[in-house]
């Protein structure tokens, strides 16, 4: 029996293990909840969710679709940190997880992003990035992806390209994969955007990236762009690609 937690389970990874006859059960929790809140189980495994809440845990949606929980395994508070304790609990005693989610009628919980990570465009559209990024990386061309768009007129993306698939696409387009400039060739970028559009077909139009910057440089723990639990350090990635991100918007505005 394999349980996955700590970071979101990639749908591609889940499918691979399922095909090998090794089911993985994704769960979810926090240190403050000792630590499990929900988990999939045998006969009730939906890998795109973190399963239903444990029998002794109550869950609800708070403001902004934030997942809030209460139950006997939830902490009483932070030791000698009164202000932090007040901040994490609602007035009626529910713990704020900080995660945006959907709770389905069957009780399954799907985490769609962090409250602080929600992208708000300059037109006021709100886009939770996690689901969008997961959809994009379901395409084998993209191994990692971060979408951007805060205070911008539309959503764009920075994506790490799978080297093997990059070579395949370059061959189809008559480009040389050994040349770094092929990544930014208009033909390749058009092909990348087409694949992004296909993989995000179920999202509203305002949530689909209209521009993408591609790179072959993976984001890792060693280069400081991933946490030890393999979560993206969004601020650092944005800083690393500031010029490239600005260029995505400048290019479209000038057209």
What name fits each language-model region?
Residues 29-33, 97, 121-122, 227-229:
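Ser/Thr-glycine-rich phosphate-binding loops at phosphate-binding pockets of nucleotides
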Residues 74, 108-137, 166-186, 205-209, ...:
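Adenylate-forming
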Residues 100, 105, 139-165:
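C-terminal boundary motif of the adenylate-forming
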Residues 7-8, 73, 164, 236:
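Alpha-helix/helix-capping structural signal
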Residues 1-45, 58, 143:
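Gly/Ser/Thr-rich phosphate-binding loop
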Residues 119, 144-147, 153, 193-255:
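Conserved C-terminal "lid"/linker of ANL adenylate-forming enzymes
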Residues 53-121, 138:
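Conserved ATP-binding/catalytic segment of the ANL
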